[in-house]
Curated annotation (Swiss-Prot):
Residues 5-47, 76-119 form the SpoVT-AbrB domain. SUPFAM superfamilies: AbrB/MazE/MraZ-like. Transmembrane segments: none annotated. This is Transcriptional regulator MraZ. It comes from Pelotomaculum thermopropionicum (strain DSM 13744 / JCM 10971 / SI). Keywords: Cytoplasm, DNA-binding, Repeat, Transcription, Transcription regulation. Belongs to the MraZ family. The keyword DNA-binding applies. Its main location: cytoplasm. CDD domains: MraZ_C, MraZ_N. It is found in: Cytoplasm, Nucleoid. GO terms for cellular component: cytoplasm; nucleoid. Forms oligomers. One of its GO terms (biological process) is negative regulation of DNA-templated transcription initiation.
Amino acid sequence: MFMGEHQHSIDPKGRLFIPARFREGLGNRFVLTKGLDGCLFAYPLPEWEALEQKLKSLPFTRGDARAFVRFFFSGAVECEADKQGRILIPLNLREYARLEKEAVIIGVSSRVEIWAKDQWEHYKGQAASSYEEIAEKIVDLNLGI
C-alpha cells in the first residue's frame, strides 16, 4: 500500500527521485501513465496488468470507453529507477502534468501519483475545503468507513 507525500526536484534532464519506500512497492519496473486531474499515475506491474484486464472488458463500441482507453494507454511507459533512485519522465508526460522543477509524489493506496508542486497545492486546497462533504457522500456507499 502506498501512502504519504514527498517533494523532490526534477533535474534538467527530466529525472525525478522516487522515495525508497515507493520504489520498493513499485518494484524494479513499473508503468507510468497520464492520470486524472492533471497528474501522472505510477502502477506496479501486477496492479497495471489487473487494471489492463478491467479496461479490456469495456465495450469498444462505446466512444467514451474507446477515448479513455486510448488516452490512458497511449501515454503509458514502462519505467525503471537508476542506481540513484531516479526515473526519467518522458517529455510528453512532463508536459501533460506540467512538471517543470518541483514535483510532489504521493501514495494513493494501490498507486503513486506525481504532481507538479503548484498543481498539487491548488488541488489540495480545493479538496480540503470539501473534505467533510466528500466523506459524507462516501459513507453513503456503505464502505464501512
